[in-house]
Amino acid sequence: MSLSALETTLNTAFDARDSITAATKGEVRDAVELALDLLDKGEARVAEPQADGAWKINQWLKKAVLISFRLNDMAPIPGGPGGAQWWDKVPSKLENYSEQKFREAGFRAVPGAIVRRSAFIAKNVVLMPSFVNLGAYVDEATMIDTWSTVGSCAQIGKHVHISGGVGIGGVLEPLQAGPVIIEDNCFIGARSEVAEGVIVRKGAVLSMGVFIGASTRIIDRATGEVYIGEVPAYSVVVPGSMPGKPLPDGSPGPSLYCAVIVKRVDEKTRSKTSINELLRE
């Protein structure tokens, strides 16, 4: 089946999703299985980079993931500590992986790493005990550190470091919402959170504890320029606050959280400078 035919089939099936159950067979099930397999192998992805720097969102692949929840019944999933099982609709990506298949895949999965089927993990990725949700894409030579979460359909670029305890938000619904995108060569500091379709552009550095959602103000302190929903390339970002409105009695109001761009570096400087040096003021 061609990709255009697959897209048409899945769009039609999604419009009639209320009629789809675990008993559904035939074209719809085959189309969903094919789409999930393409996602799992990295041969298709929910968001694709374009030559002009924009990202194309393939909503039909998100629809395939959503339809799969209606097609699949709950079932035991083995692999829990002490022989325990989980109870879910989505099998593990790593279920039945042999030594040969791990060697061919070329990534490391430390005990405690959980990856759901339809997430793609590229070569030379290191997965510490972490969670990668369905439909996500993790590109080459990236580190997903301990207790980090890569949400559904999130896109993580090459040579990215997702530090310990980071949350990368997922998105399946609403359909029109775009996924979180972390472009190549980014560093996301420990316990930071990037959610609600935010794009972190190439080479950006987020310090520890930076929280960015769709409405978070990202302020360049050198220019006063305000960004929302996107961290500019090669920015170095730290947590900050901005003055709030005065209270009714005229006294100062509470400050509001924001993220602050403290400096920008070029690609050459970024590649030669340690993260600690970039963040040191």
Curated annotation (Swiss-Prot):
Q: Which BP terms from GO are recorded?
A: diaminopimelate biosynthetic process; lysine biosynthetic process via diaminopimelate
**Which catalysed reactions does the entry list for this protein?**
(S)-2,3,4,5-tetrahydrodipicolinate + succinyl-CoA + H2O = (S)-2-succinylamino-6-oxoheptanedioate + CoA
State if Cytoplasm is listed as a keyword: yes
InterPro entries recorded: DapD_Trfase_Hexpep_rpt_fam, Hexapep, THP_succinylTrfase_dom1, THP_succinylTrfase_N_sf, Trimer_LpxA-like_sf
Which SUPFAM superfamilies does the UniProt record give?
Answer: Trimeric LpxA-like enzymes
Its annotated pathway reads: Amino-acid biosynthesis; L-lysine biosynthesis via DAP pathway; LL-2,6-diaminopimelate from (S)-tetrahydrodipicolinate (succinylase route): step 1/3
| MF terms (GO), sorted A to Z | 2,3,4,5-tetrahydropyridine-2,6-dicarboxylate N-succinyltransferase activity; nucleotidyltransferase activity
| Record protein name field | 2,3,4,5-tetrahydropyridine-2,6-dicarboxylate N-succinyltransferase
Please report the organism this UniProt entry assigns to the protein.
Answer: Afipia carboxidovorans (strain ATCC 49405 / DSM 1227 / KCTC 32145 / OM5) (Oligotropha carboxidovorans)
